[in-house]
């Protein structure tokens, strides 16, 4: 059995109009961003990791962007500012998380933003019991504002650990059924999901949590942020789609579930009276030759949706950057921070 923990904790916020923190201000000070935002948020996450370690967790999932550097990543027209505050991986933040993972001999999955040269990712790392990085994942599906300065990932890796095979998705990835379907093809036992929220309304979010797990017979551990993005409700779901740990709404807490991650789902299917590995049966019966339309760049439905101007313009570069500017209360036309 492995003890899985999901951390639900609210970030330490900042005022986007604080000129020392705002990358669009002439008074921007990277040192203040690090001292007022990044390091306090990392330390808060470290406190939660220590708490989970004291409770003998084998793997702990932290939220998306646990160091709260996402808005700076999106400021692509302020390259020097964002380069000064966003960490590389490995770096200061992963070293802090890794030290606690090593202290308690546990795995950590943490959402982070990553700088690779001039490229930025919404990432998540898997850290092993020895404090070393086992692997990392780059978010594939990015929101409009993220696309202003963050680069999409391109694959769905799975990593071997002593408790089972671990895969990762981040936030907006969850909205796309194809994401978990693709990840499931790589055979994870546990899917870790750092996020700011379900993306859907709360009731529909619960449904998708159950269905995504049951559809692919995988365990899922969600770590959400109870914040302005959503009310929280982190949860852990088993292969049968049953919620086995639930953080509830608007709470700062850690939830735990003891799971045998390698235990397959043996039950009846309504037209098949045999008792066998349901996940295995569903994979054996797949018809991938009929799914080709899913990988078409221009499926018939896209033409219909692109006829709507607001959809067509959604990812134009100026629209993306406008969303990033709005996040910083920046009036680009007049080059000023709005009060």
List the predicted regions and their residue ranges.
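Short beta->alpha transition motifs characteristic of CBS
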Residues: 72-75, 125, 137-143, 235, ...
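C-terminal beta-strand edge segments of enzyme domains
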Residues: 158, 225-339
């Amino acid at each position: 059995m492995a003890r899985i923990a999901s951390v639900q904790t609210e970030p330490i916020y900042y005022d986007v109009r604080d000129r020392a923190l705002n990358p669009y201000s002439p008074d921007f000070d990277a040192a203040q961003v690090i001292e007022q935002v990044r390091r306090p948020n990392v330390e808060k996450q470290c406190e939660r990791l220590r708490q989970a370690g004291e409770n003998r967790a084998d793997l702990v999932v932290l939220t998306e962007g646990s160091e709260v550097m996402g808005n700076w990543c999106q400021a692509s027209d302020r390259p020097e500012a964002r380069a000064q505050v966003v960490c590389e991986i490995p770096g200061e933040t992963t070293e802090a998380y890794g030290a606690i993972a090593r202290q308690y001999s546990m795995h950590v999955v943490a959402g982070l933003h990553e700088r690779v040269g001039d490229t930025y990712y919404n990432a998540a790392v898997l850290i092993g019991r020895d404090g070393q990085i086992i692997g990392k994942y780059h978010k594939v599906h990015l929101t409009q504002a993220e696309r202003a300065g963050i680069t999409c990932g391109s694959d769905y890796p799975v990593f071997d650990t002593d408790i089972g095979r671990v895969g990762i998705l981040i936030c907006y990835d969850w909205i796309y059924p194809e994401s978990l379907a693709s990840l499931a093809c790589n055979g994870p036992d546990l899917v870790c999901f750092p996020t700011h929220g379900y993306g859907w309304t709360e009731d529909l979010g619960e449904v998708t949590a159950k269905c995504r797990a049951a559809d692919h017979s995988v365990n899922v551990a969600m770590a959400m942020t109870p914040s302005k993005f959503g009310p929280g409700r982190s949860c852990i779901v088993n292969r049968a789609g049953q919620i086995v740990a639930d953080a509830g709404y608007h709470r700062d807490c850690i939830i735990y579930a003891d799971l045998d991650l390698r235990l397959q789902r043996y039950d009846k299917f309504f037209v098949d009276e045999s008792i066998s590995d349901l996940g295995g049966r569903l994979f054996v019966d797949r018809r991938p030759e009929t799914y080709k339309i899913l990988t078409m760049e221009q499926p018939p439905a896209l033409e219909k949706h692109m006829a709507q101007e607001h959809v067509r313009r959604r990812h134009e570069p100026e629209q993306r950057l406008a969303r990033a500017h709005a996040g910083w209360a920046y009036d680009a036309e007049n080059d000023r921070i709005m009060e």
